[in-house]
Regions:
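A short, conserved strand-capping beta-turn/loop at the end of a beta strand
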Residues: 54-64
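Short amphipathic alpha-helical interaction segments
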Residues: 30-46, 50-56, 73
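Short, amphipathic alpha-helical interaction segments positioned at domain boundaries
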Residues: 62-93
Length: 93
């Protein structure tokens, strides 16, 4: 797995994050949106992270959707398989 993808997985494992929060991680400033999207899709496809919808009641209002956009309503969580991968590769003890 790419080093950037592993770092994204480690960050999501530490704290569940939205796409915007992942995008604003300090070590991803030089990575394109395509690279971040590819890493997240790879993690989802390999079942290392899951998406969960949050703030479902807030998202029903039109002004909330206009202000925050689509990506705010989902958070990424590390799965058990993802945490096991991190342990095997030395990110967790």
């Amino acid at each position: 797995m790419l080093e950037v993808t592993e770092k994204i997985l480690a960050s999501i494992n530490a704290t569940p994050m939205t796409y915007g929060e992942v995008e604003n991680l300090p070590y991803l400033k030089t990575i394109s949106h395509y690279g971040i999207d590819y890493s997240i899709e790879t993690l989802i496809r390999k079942d290392y992270i899951n998406e969960k919808i949050v703030d479902r009641h807030k998202f029903r209002t039109e002004e909330y959707r206009r202000e925050y956009g689509e990506f705010v309503r989902t958070k990424y969580y590390a799965t058990r398989k993802g945490r096991r991968y991190l342990m095997e590769h030395g990110y967790l003890e």
